Each structure stands twice: as structure tokens, then as C-alpha cells.
């Protein structure tokens, strides 16, 4: 058996440490921007931390609770001095729980949560209403310093209006208090009345012809102005 060279181990250890550091940095850089929008990390006693620690295969990174695929399931932006959730907020549309308490939020948040169909717990400052109101949540509980919206309702099951969507469309939830009508397979256009696949070739052909016509018109106008000046 060949003698073991201690020098090779000395060389290997720093290399392995550098590799682990590089992988850690790469993972940190791969975090969605919303997770690092606010300095610090998820507070240990927050509901987001409790959800993440009591659900298997979830982990806390910065302000997010992620699964092993990197999908955001929890977001804790409490006490971040936010007047609005910010342009990256929709990166968290897969969340089950969000904490926004202790922020000076302003304006109506109704459309802020469009697409957040999995959201089940939303913690807001006490002065901010739950998006969609009582019709969008099973329970709304107000406390001295926050308001908790719990159990997002499926408005498509609660509207009681079968004529809300056209004949060839169906109702689909689109976030708290929001819904949309989606055309059935094979239908598209206004009120889902057009049948057959949407022709991209025709669309881009019309778009190209229109753009060309406008360009020629502008060019001719500029030449006319140049001649008269």
C-alpha cells in the first residue's frame, strides 16, 4: 500500500474550503431580490419562522422561507419601513404566509396580491385592510399592532353568478378578492368567442405592416419639413 502523503491533505483542505465558500456565495447570489430587499433575517419568534421550522424540507434564507427548489413559501418583511411592497414583490407570488406588519404602508393593496393564489396567512399593519375584505378571507382578526387575514377564499365558488364568465370560459382564482375568466382550450379573443388557435404569424404580420406604414409616413413627413425649411 502506498504511503499517505500528508502534504496532499494540506493542499486539499484549503481547496475544499474555497469550493464550499464559492458554492455558498453562488447560492446567496441566487436568492430572489425580494428576499434581500430588507436588511437582516426572519425574526425567530415570527409566524414565518414558525411555519418554516415546523414544515419539513423548508429553510430560512435572509427574509424568505424557501423549499429545496428555491420557491418562496414564506416572506417576512416586517419592520422594513416600507410604504409599498416594492417592484420585486411579485417574486413571492408562491407564498403561503407573508408578514408585512410594522410598516407605514400606504394606498390600496387590492391589486398588489394579484396572482398570490396560494396565500393563506397575511399579517398587515393594524391600519391596513385585508385585500378583498371579509369576502376574500375566512377570518380577519384585528389586534392592537397588526391585522391577520387567514384562509383565502375561492371567489369562483362564492360568487353564485354562473354568467360571470362567458360560455366558453371558466372562472379561475387570481389572488385575494380577485378572479379571472380563462378561455377553454380551442377558444380565444373577446368573450372567448373565437375558435381555433391564435395565429401568431398573422398577428406579427399585421404588426409589422402597421409599423412599416407608420415609419414610411414619418419619414415622408420629415423629408417634407426638410425641403420647406
From Swiss-Prot:
Full protein name: All-trans retinoic acid-induced differentiation factor
Describe the subunit structure. Answer: Interacts with NELL1; the interaction promotes osteoblastic differentiation and mineralization. Interacts with SLC37A3; the interaction is direct and both proteins are mutually dependent for their stability.
Residues modified by glycosylation: 44, 79, 157, 168
Cytoplasmic side, ranges: 221-229
Provide GO CC annotations from the record. intracellular membrane-bounded organelle; lysosomal membrane; nuclear envelope; perinuclear region of cytoplasm; plasma membrane
Give the protein's function: Promotes osteoblast cell differentiation and terminal mineralization. Plays a role in inducing the cell cycle arrest via inhibiting CCND1 expression in all-trans-retinoic acid (ATRA) signal pathway. In osteoclasts, forms a transporter complex with ATRAID for nitrogen-containing-bisphophonates (N-BPs) required for releasing N-BP molecules that have trafficked to lysosomes through fluid-phase endocytosis into the cytosol.
Q: Where the protein is mainly located, per its record?
A: nucleus
Q: Which UniProt keywords apply?
A: Cell membrane, Differentiation, Disulfide bond, EGF-like domain, Glycoprotein, Lysosome, Membrane, Nucleus, Signal, Transmembrane, Transmembrane helix
The secretion signal range is 1-30
Give the intrachain disulfide bonds: 156-171, 165-181, 183-192
Entry keyword Cell division: no
Q: Which residues cross the membrane?
A: 200-220
Induction entry: Up-regulated by all-trans-retinoic acid (ATRA) in several tumor cell lines.
Tissues expressing the protein: Weakly expressed in hematopoietic cell lines.
Q: Name one GO molecular function term.
A: xenobiotic transmembrane transporter activity
Subcellular location per UniProt equals: Nucleus envelope; Cell membrane; Lysosome membrane
Mention one GO biological process in which this protein takes part, according to its record. Answer: cell differentiation
How does the record classify its membrane topology?
Answer: Single-pass membrane protein; Multi-pass membrane protein
Enumerate the spans annotated as EGF-like domain: 152-193
Matches recorded under PROSITE patterns: EGF_1, EGF_2, EGF_3
Key word Disulfide bond present: yes
* Membrane topology, Extracellular segments: 31-199
